[in-house]
Amino acid sequence: MPSPVATVETDSLQQPILGSRRPSNYFWAIAVSVGGTGFLLAGLSSYLQVNLLPFSEPTRLAFLPQGLVMGLYGIAAILLASYLWFVISLDVGGGYNAFDRKTQKATIFRWGFPGKNRRVEITYPLSDIQAVRVDIKEGLNPKRALYLKVKGRGDVPLTRVGQPLPLTELESQGAELARFLAVPLEGL
């Protein structure tokens, strides 16, 4: 994740948030696309008795049940890959956190799925922000996240979903944001 961009001249801080365009999502979309295409071509090869895969001999497979099952697995994988590529192209979950002293506003923006909630934008006055909270839970399913404590509302998550941030990066982002907003940093 890129580091936050703070400028003293404009009195603003902007933190980009990586959404579904993570390297792991690209890896899985490519792997499922290639695997699904291979399975579908193997199933079609066994049905048509024409070798559609140059590196193997799927025409030797009996269509029932092996060829049929491989074709169905291929179709399922291609549908899953299509969903992954769709989500990546929309950058679901991506966006930014922007804090501006001139306008006295904090803006949390994320991209969603198509529909009425495609653009999720939440704006708070800076005066309503009470603290920046760091949430760290270690163990089998670790959780490391930054939250804004906003007066009269619940905690607002600021970090991306997915792979937890390294502790040093989480601490430095939290400290920089708390210093910029002149609020306490809680949870460390």
From Swiss-Prot:
Its GO CC terms are: photosystem I; plasma membrane-derived thylakoid membrane
List, in alphabetical order, the GO biological process terms annotated in this UniProt record.
Answer: photosynthesis
Signal peptide feature range: none
The main place the protein resides is: membrane
Where are its TM segments located? 26-46, 68-88
InterPro entries cross-referenced by the UniProt entry: PSI_Ycf4_assembly (IPR003359)
Report the locations given in the UniProt record.
Answer: Cellular thylakoid membrane
Annotated membrane topology: Multi-pass membrane protein
Q: Which UniProt keywords apply?
A: Membrane, Photosynthesis, Thylakoid, Transmembrane, Transmembrane helix
Job description of the protein: Seems to be required for the assembly of the photosystem I complex.
Record family assignment: Belongs to the Ycf4 family.
Q: What is this protein called?
A: Photosystem I assembly protein Ycf4
Q: Which organism is it from?
A: Synechococcus sp. (strain ATCC 27144 / PCC 6301 / SAUG 1402/1)
Protein's gene: ycf4
